[in-house]
Swiss-Prot record:
Its EC number is 3.6.4.-. The keyword Cytoplasm applies. One of its GO terms (cellular component) is Holliday junction resolvase complex. Keywords: ATP-binding, Cytoplasm, DNA damage, DNA recombination, DNA repair, DNA-binding, Hydrolase, Nucleotide-binding. PANTHER family: HOLLIDAY JUNCTION BRANCH MIGRATION COMPLEX SUBUNIT RUVB, PTHR42848. It comes from Bifidobacterium longum (strain DJO10A). InterPro entries: AAA+_ATPase (IPR003593), AAA_lid_4 (IPR041445), DNA_helicase_Holl-junc_RuvB (IPR004605), P-loop_NTPase (IPR027417), RuvB-like_N (IPR008824), RuvB_C (IPR008823), WH-like_DNA-bd_sf (IPR036388), WH_DNA-bd_sf (IPR036390). Residues 199-269 are annotated as: Small ATPAse domain (RuvB-S). It is found in: Cytoplasm. This is Holliday junction branch migration complex subunit RuvB. It is an enzyme of class 3 (hydrolase). Residues 272-348 are annotated as: Head domain (RuvB-H). Its main location: cytoplasm.
Length: 348
């Protein structure tokens, strides 16, 4: 399986998020370093059992019919394995994969150039497909449905459109914002898969597999401690495992015990709930400085010394999902769970 990669630039929110150890966005050279941890077959992909069963049936049917499969949309939060699944699909089908992203496609012509160079059966993986320019989306509609692109020849009033037939190929789109995809584009995907956050048990299995690949000898319970801090996200789990590996190397540890995991990640201010410095600062401010809330976003951001957008888009989603905080029309309110953690039992 050959592969061509074109990674686009991240947006501002992603840049803020990427500064955190518990970010679900890639940090630094992670797209490259993660390659060694990626499974190459569907059977080696840990987690998402229902999705795997559906995808296996989908691919088996395409192989038996001896035709490229329908287009695939992979939707879900970042860091759950959408890119890995796209690579697995191409590998299972034994076809090349071309990789690009929505931000990397600046003009419709960029996408037309990629499409016109595809071979029969090739997979085109478009990460962040919801960020394609409108003109590129419209070109992709036709390419996915009719396997052709219309090439403009000439300029001005004399310009004409010449249809260029494309070989049958498969688009795999990945998105963290499925709702931002136009309905005509969504309708052209024959298979849509939704990835969910991982339960601790599945994350432990994934961590143990990654530890074997990286040569990290984890003691009983160590994978569990890592899973607790990984926010249900494989990308975060693998990142934290690498930092624990660094700790083990520096301290000449043959076996990494649970206490070693706790001590190593405490250095990065990550607690057993997966909360980091910013999360703790936000919750601490709501509970102690604002008596549990409600508090407005701007006041909360000023209290923790961050931009309002950073608090809202980078910090709050996890705190709300895990039940530490709720958003109300009057502002942010800490839950009983946050009150207990921060030792505040005052009645509101």
């Amino acid at each position: 399986m050959s592969e061509t990669t074109d990674y686009g630039a991240s947006n501002t929110g992603a840049n803020e998020e990427s500064l955190r150890m518990v970010s679900s966005q890639p940090i630094g050279n992670e797209p490259v370093s993660d390659e060694e941890l990626r499974p190459h077959v569907l059977g080696g992909f840990i987690g998402q059992p229902r999705l795997k069963a559906q995808l296996q049936l989908f691919l088996d049917a395409a192989r038996k019919r001896d035709v490229p499969p329908d287009h695939i949309l992979l939707a879900g939060p970042p860091g759950l394995g959408k890119t890995t699944l796209a690579m697995i699909v191409a590998n299972e089908l034994e076809v090349p994969i071309r990789v690009t992203s929505g931000p990397a496609v600046q003009h419709a012509g960029d996408l037309a150039s990629i499409l016109s160079s595809l071979d029969v059966g090739e997979v085109l993986f478009i990460d962040e497909i919801h960020r394609l320019p409108r003109a590129a989306e419209e070109l992709l509609y036709i390419a996915m449905e009719d396997f052709r692109v219309d090439v403009m020849v000439g300029k001005g009033p004399g310009a004409s459109s010449i249809p260029l037939t494309l070989p049958r190929f498969t688009v795999i789109g990945a998105t963290t914002r499925e709702g931002m995809l136009p309905s005509p584009l969504r309708a052209r995907f024959g298979f849509t898969a939704h990835l969910d956050f991982y339960p601790h048990e599945e994350l432990e299995k994934l961590i143990e597999r990654s530890a074997n690949v990286l040569g990290v000898n984890l003691d009983t319970g160590s994978a569990h401690e890592l899973a607790l801090r990984s926010r249900g996200t494989p990308r975060i789990a693998n990142r934290l495992l690498r930092r624990v590996r660094d700790w083990a190397i520096v301290h000449d540890l043959i076996v990494v015990r649970p206490d070693d995991v706790k001590e190593a990640l405490a250095l990065y201010q990550i607690d057993s709930e997966g909360l980091d410095r910013l999360d703790i600062a936000v919750l601490n401010a709501i509970v102690r400085n604002f008596n549990g809330g409600p508090v407005g976003l701007n006041n909360l951001a000023a209290m923790v010394g961050e931009e309002s957008e950073t608090v809202e888009t980078v910090c709050e989603p996890y705190l709300v999902r895990e039940g530490f905080m709720i958003r109300t029309p009057k502002g942010r309110v800490a839950t009983e769970l946050a009150d207990i953690i921060f030792g505040n039992y005052a009645q509101r």
